[in-house]
Amino acid sequence: MSNKKEIEGKETVEIFQELDQNVVRSEKFIEKNAKKIGLAFGVVVLGVLGYFGYQHFVVDPKNEEATKAYLTAQKNLMEGKEDLALGGKTANPGFKGTAENFSETSAGKLSAYSAGLIEFSKGNYQKAYDLLDEFSSKNKTLVALKHGAMGDCMVNLNKNDDALSQFEKAISASDDEYTSYYFTRKAGMLALSLKKNDVAKKYFTAIEEKYQDYDGGASDAYIEMVKHF
């Protein structure tokens, strides 16, 4: 059961991390992940690319400085240099330093998210959670993915009630049906594994009523199971 939870707990973070690593190669990202992410992928890609829009970074020199620091860290990450990308030292601010020094900028917020993903990959789930919590965006799908990743951190810390709370926030935050379906199913699976049958029934019933087009029948067995609890 623990292996299953660990695998499921990595799903959201891996989607979010893959999005980040490919943001400067958006065409390849879309081609690679269109089937996996479904109708949500276009909104997510556009949302992240929006962080690097002209209007956000050329007016304020601090924004420009933050962006340069972020892109340097991003380059290190794409080259497989995770420790350099994470940074945190004066000579190499990396994502952590950029998040700390430019927390009010869009690049600073995105750096907090990126640092959180690296900490997650290192198994530092509480640090990852705290960093992800600093990320904010006007894009509702990105906010949903943030809460989903925070939920994954809680799963790996065996704080399952907190994980369910984060998945619920992810469901509520998103204005994209596929993303809402994804986290509804994720919450249902977690509730089922915890034997919280009434809670699981709520989520799977929501899938049956709202998201059958995205589910493809994959949740039918779980829906039938919880109907009799």
Name each model feature, range by range.
Residues 98-108, 122, 136-144, 171-180, ...:
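Short solvent-exposed coil/turn linkers within tandem alpha-helical repeat scaffolds
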